[in-house]
C-alpha cells in the first residue's frame, strides 16, 4: 500500500505542475500611459513617372488634410520665396533657402488616372474650378480641407488626369 500511495502522490504533484495551477494576486495598481497622437504624414521618394496612383491613397489624402506631406526630402509648407527646383520628374516652387521646404510641387501624370478615380477617392470634397472649359470631364479640380492648409489640384483633360499640383494657394498650373 505504501508503494501505491507514493505513486498517487507523485502523479498528483506531476499533474499539478503540468497544469501549472498558480494564483497570482493582482494587488499592484495598474497605470495607464497616455499615447501621443501621431499626426498623419506621407513621404514619397524617387520618380513619380507612371506611378502616380498614390494620389488616390487615403493615407496621402489624410496627410494633405493635416498639412504633412514630403517629397524627396522636401516638405510642402508655406514659404515666401520664388526659387524653383527640378528634382527627379517633379518641379518644386517656392523652395526655401535651405532647400528642405517648398510651397508647391507639380508633376505630370503619365498613367491612366481618370476623373472618376479622383472623384471616388476625394468624394464630395472634390470641387471643380470655374474656368475656361465648359466640358464636364475637363478642367481643374481641387481638394483643400481649409484655406490655410495644403491643397491638391488636378488638371483633367477629357476624363484623364494629366497634371497634379500639391501645395498652398495661390495655385498656378502650367496648363
Curated annotation (Swiss-Prot):
<comment type="similarity">
    <text>Belongs to the IsaB family.</text>
</comment>
<feature type="signal peptide">
    <location>
        <begin position="1"/>
        <end position="36"/>
    </location>
</feature>
<protein>
    <recommendedName>
        <fullName>Immunodominant staphylococcal antigen B</fullName>
    </recommendedName>
</protein>
<keyword id="KW-0964">Secreted</keyword>
<keyword id="KW-0732">Signal</keyword>
<dbReference type="GO" id="GO:0005576">
    <property type="term" value="C:extracellular region"/>
</dbReference>
Amino acid at each position: 500500500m505504501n508503494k501505491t500511495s507514493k505513486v498517487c502522490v507523485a502523479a498528483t504533484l506531476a499533474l499539478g505542475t503540468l497544469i501549472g495551477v498558480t494564483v497570482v494576486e493582482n494587488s499592484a495598481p495598474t497605470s495607464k500611459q497616455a499615447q501621443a497622437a501621431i499626426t498623419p504624414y506621407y513621404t514619397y521618394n524617387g520618380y513619380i513617372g507612371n506611378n502616380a496612383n498614390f494620389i488616390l491613397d487615403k493615407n496621402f489624402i489624410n496627410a494633405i488634410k493635416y498639412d504633412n506631406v514630403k517629397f524627396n526630402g522636401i516638405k510642402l509648407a508655406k514659404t515666401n520665396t520664388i526659387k524653383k527646383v527640378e528634382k527627379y520628374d517633379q518641379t518644386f516652387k517656392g523652395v526655401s533657402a535651405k532647400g528642405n521646404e517648398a510651397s508647391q510641387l507639380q508633376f505630370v501624370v503619365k498613367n491612366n488616372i481618370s476623373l472618376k478615380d479622383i472623384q471616388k477617392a476625394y468624394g464630395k470634397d472634390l470641387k471643380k474650378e470655374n474656368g475656361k472649359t465648359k466640358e464636364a470631364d475637363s478642367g481643374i479640380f481641387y481638394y483643400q480641407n481649409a484655406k490655410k492648409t495644403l491643397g491638391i489640384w488636378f488638371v483633367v483633360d477629357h476624363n484623364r488626369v494629366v497634371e497634379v499640383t500639391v501645395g498652398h494657394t495661390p495655385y498656378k498650373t502650367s496648363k
